[in-house]
A protein has these predicted regions:
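The feature primarily captures lumenal catalytic ectodomains
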Residues: 1-198
Length: 198
């Protein structure tokens, strides 16, 4: 989505007049576009097919594994939240993101953690609509979450929100969410965890 802004800035034009080509199908991307950019046109290249284009703009991705983030980009994306927020309330919730249906990145001692964090609200992002995810993170003062794409929702948090990201030690070099938090004024900590056989 941030690439839309690059086109808009570079050519001072409406990015929705272009057709976007995706390498892989993404249900999340489709939901985002349907909600925020209903007029956007995009296609997914089927596997084992080769396409030829007369005109093609290819955005760079110099750090594919960690993502690229510039300070102005999350601020631009963040304004989209105003389109779907049902109401503006002061942040007041302490939430724990759980991944009970996930194959990996589950928290083995989650029940003990929930007992220790009495009063915190458990949230399963997979069961929420995009609008509900935006609202949930906008209302949070504290967030504990395993590393994962759901932390993209940090975009909707107010400055000063405290975040603890649980991640495996081998992921230490992945700084995309701490960098995102830095640009948004969030207080982000990373807790390195061990892998336990299930």
């Amino acid at each position: 989505v941030s690439k839309f802004r690059l086109i808009e800035k570079r050519w001072s034009t409406n990015f929705e007049k272009y057709v976007f080509i995706l390498a892989n199908k993404s249900k999340y991307f489709e939901k985002i576009c349907k909600l925020f950019f209903p007029d956007l046109k995009f296609l997914t290249v089927p596997k084992n097919e080769t396409w030829r284009f007369q005109h093609l703009i290819v955005p760079s991705m110099s750090n594919y594994n960690d993502g690229i983030l510039t300070p102005h980009m999350p601020v631009w994306i963040r304004h989209l939240a105003n389109l779907v927020k049902k109401k503006h309330t002061r942040p007041h919730k302490k939430i724990i993101i759980t991944r009970t249906d996930a194959v990996n990145r589950n928290i083995k001692n989650q029940q003990h953690m929930l007992i220790a964090l009495k009063g915190w609200e458990c949230v399963e992002l997979e069961k929420l609509s995009i609008q509900e995810q935006v609202q949930t993170f906008a209302e949070a003062t504290h967030i504990v979450s395993p590393h994962g794409a759901g932390l993209t929702n940090l975009l909707w948090c107010d400055p000063g929100t405290k975040v603890i990201e649980l991640t495996h030690k081998s992921f230490f070099g992945k700084k995309v969410y701490p960098v995102l938090s830095h640009h948004l004024g969030l207080k982000h900590s990373v807790l390195l965890c061990d892998t336990v056989p299930i």
